[in-house]
């Protein structure tokens, strides 16, 4: 299924906007790595795209939901198909841009932008399937540098709740389709709320450890136990690009 077809099922509850969207998607798909002006054949076409996305009735969640509902989770094999949900955050830096004053701090107070948190679904052979969820986070100036002061806040009010929300979104797919889902995230997702949220037997996770946690009914902590394990094998991950090639080798017991 092409990206265009998966988005054309979107229903914006407005016939005019839905028709406009059906025109815009093929236009943008022709140049996924290009800007809107670059994908537009004239100024009127460009302004039409900008007007569409500025419309308050156009909600990102409705577009992504329509996309997810059209994804093909079937598999030709007789076994239960396995999918990976890759979840991570990126900083969108708009420092020096016209709208920078309306955004929040990033690594330092004068660096202005927003946090983009994506969860991408891929097949276990590495082929991309689609975008599961996307969140934008604009930090407040008054909260900058006060992470310790925010510790007593309810978890739902913390930025790290994004990991839990995306984990739950991935787990929900297990209730809708016959599949195995593996949630993959970096050490920021090493949060007890995420682990406690696992409910479905086909929902799994691979999360890089950040905390040397205590283990249930075991005298050692996590890292102490791993240090005592015998390496049983290694794996290679080859990431290729037309201009670069990266080969990463890791001991199996390290992960």
Regions found by a protein language model. Give the residues of each.
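Short, conserved catalytic/metal-binding motifs centered on acidic residues
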Residues: 84-90, 182-189, 205
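A short acidic-Thr-Gly-centered motif at the start of a beta-strand
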Residues: 64-79, 166-178, 196-197
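Electropositive, glycine- and tryptophan-enriched low-complexity nucleic-acid-binding patches
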Residues: 110-175
């Amino acid at each position: 299924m092409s990206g265009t077809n998966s988005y054309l099922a979107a229903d914006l509850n407005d016939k005019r906007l839905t028709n406009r969207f059906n025109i815009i998607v093929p236009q943008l798909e022709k140049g996924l790595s290009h800007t809107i002006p670059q994908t537009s054949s004239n100024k009127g076409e460009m302004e039409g795209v900008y007007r569409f996305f500025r419309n308050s009735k156009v909600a990102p969640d409705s577009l992504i939901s329509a996309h997810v509902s059209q994804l093909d989770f079937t598999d030709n094999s007789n076994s239960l198909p396995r999918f990976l949900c890759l979840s991570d955050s990126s900083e969108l830096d708009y420092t020096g841009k016209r709208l920078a004053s309306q955004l929040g701090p990033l690594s330092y107070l004068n660096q202005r932008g927003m946090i983009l948190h994506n969860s991408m679904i891929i097949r276990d052979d590495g082929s991309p399937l689609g975008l599961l969820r996307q969140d934008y986070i604009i930090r407040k100036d008054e909260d900058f540098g006060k992470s310790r002061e925010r510790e007593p806040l309810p978890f739902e009010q913390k930025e790290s709740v994004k990991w839990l929300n995306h984990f739950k979104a991935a787990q929900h797919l297990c209730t809708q389709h016959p599949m195995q889902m593996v949630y993959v995230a970096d050490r920021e997702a090493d949060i007890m709320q995420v682990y406690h949220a696992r409910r479905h037997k086909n929902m799994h996770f691979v999360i890089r450890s950040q905390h040397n946690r205590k283990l249930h009914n075991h005298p050692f902590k996590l890292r102490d136990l791993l240090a005592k394990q015998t390496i049983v094998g290694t794996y290679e991950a080859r990431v290729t690009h037309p201009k670069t090639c990266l080969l990463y080798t890791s001991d199996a017991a390290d992960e």
